[in-house]
Amino acid sequence: MLAIISDLHLTDGTTGMLSPPSAGDVLCDRLCDLAWRASWRADGSYRPIERIDLVLLGDILDLMSSRRWLQMPCRPWDDPHLAAVSDTVGGIVDEILRRNVDAIRTLRGLATEGTVSLPPATASGQPVLEAEELPVAVCTHYMVGNRDWPLHLGGTAYDLIRHKVTHHLGLVTPYNRPFPHAADECPELFDTLRRHRVLARHGDLYDPLSYALDRDSASVSDVLAIELVARFVQHAEGELGDQLNPATRMALAELEQVRPMLLAGSYLDAALERTAPAAVRGRIKRMWDYMVDQVLCLEALRRLGGIDSGELTDALAAALKIGRRDGQAWIRRTLEFLERLQGTQGLSLVPHALAEADFRNRRARHIVYGHTHQPEMVPLDASHADGFVLSQTYFNAGSWRRRYQPTQMLVGQPELAVSDSFSLLCFYQADERSGRTYETWTGMLGPAIPTTEMPVTSGSAAPGASIVRAPQFASRSAAARSMP
């Protein structure tokens, strides 16, 4: 049995919000339930599985969302083998491990404390429910994404950092060589995925803003995370201090959670309209636009952009600057730019899954990415030959973080709706799970709404022409309409 989770984004607490402890409980409960179900075989008998491979598919530790970078003379886009850079990465990792003790304890417990256990089986293939349960070995593998890419760097300094991560998370991934970005960089992981006919990668490879020269270097998204989002929030809190009410402070803290990151300006504009007095609101918006201009002048951003620097800066300015917004078209225009940049439709990475060699040669039955924070299951192909059907499917592993999504009613002020999410993918081999090949679990938890908060409504009605009406067959018949 193979389980995959992605995009936990555990931070050092200097930006954004820490993951709730309950997330670890959900993961353990799901894995225990899935292990029990996987132990029922295709012939109807019960035979407990002996092993679960858990793949952490990148962006588990978020090494870029930290104000610690602002306190240092170095940045991730400097030479990563400078002592100052590796020391900063090490300090951030130490703080992440300390501040997220519940999540870390959960992952380590799965690997080392027998968290998942199953009843033994009788000779006739039935569970002995009253007997002491047997622990199931959990082998946890780590793959890097665009927020934890320094763990892909070689060298003694990074070996020491990986050693801490391996110890605290209970990984089977060797610490004395770079954590893999592609599965073939780690033979143990490669064999595990191949047994389950899965091709898995984080997916940042297909996002030019999150992947520049190679996976041993920074990207545009790192510059935006540190020099724009983290610096802006720190500056706003320092400049305005007590003028920020609790709701506005919370809105600023949540800025780091917004994905895609280019929607940060849209989120900030809408959040300030709801939470901040007019005078404070105007100052914050001007401060944001000023910092966007400063970031767009950075040499690092132009160097890492990978496309024409003028085109990139113009597009980033149009997406991020509140002063350049044009109402309901703002979010749509930003998403269209990202689609063109990534070569996708709707920001789904399906087109890239269709181009994978392992999909085209049918070696992989399942193509799995993360990165987008958007859980997906999309059928790719079904091949029929000699009575056998090979179905190939694309999955996105989603996220275990808060998500902000553009609303569909793009009338007036652009809005992003919030929810907390989790997503777990599971793949079976041979006769596990009664012969099934995969199972997915995705959950959404809506936000808590203060009882004193009244809904804010627009003073004007939304135009009705663009609203989808009831289907034709739902309308009343002519006879019915003629009745009094």
Predicted regions and their residues:
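Extended recognition/assembly regions associated with phosphoester-bond processing machinery
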Residues: M1-P484
